[in-house]
UniProtKB/Swiss-Prot annotation:
GO terms for cellular component: cytosolic large ribosomal subunit. This protein is located at the 30S-50S ribosomal subunit interface and may play a role in the structure and function of the aminoacyl-tRNA binding site. GO terms for molecular function: structural constituent of ribosome. InterPro entries: Ribosomal_bL19 (IPR001857), Ribosomal_bL19_CS (IPR018257), Ribosomal_bL19_sf (IPR038657), Translation_prot_SH3-like_sf (IPR008991). Belongs to the bacterial ribosomal protein bL19 family. One of its GO terms (biological process) is translation. Pfam families: Ribosomal_L19. This is Large ribosomal subunit protein bL19. The gene is rplS.
Amino acid sequence: MAANIIKELEREEAQRLLAARAIPEFEPGDTLRVNVRIKEGERERVQAYEGVCIARSGGGVHESFTVRKISFGEGVERLFPLLSPSIESIEVKRRGVVRRAKLYYLRDRRGKSARIAERSNVRKVEVADAE
C-alpha cells in the first residue's frame, strides 16, 4: 500500500513539473543543445552544452539523459536529470537514425565512424503536427 502512495505522489509531481516547462520529444541519437544555469559565487549564467543524446534512463521524476560531445579532441559526457531546475531549456538540433536505445558504442569510435545519419522523415511529422 505504501509503495502505491509513493508511486502516485511521484507521478503527480512529474506531471506538475512537465506542465510547468516545455520539454521537447527526443530520443537517443538526436543532437541536443541543453542550456544549463551555472552558479559561480554570486553570479549566475547560462551555458549551452551541445552534443548527441546517447541514453535516456529512469522514469517519472527520476528520468535522466546522457549527452556526449567532443571537446578539444576529448569525449565529454554529461548526465542531466530531465526535470532538473538547473536546466533552462532543451533544443533538438538534429534528429538521428539509430537502432539502439543506448549508444555507448560511440565511446569507442572517432571521426566519421562516430557519425549518426539524420532522420529524413522529420518534415512529414512537423507538417502533420501543424494540421
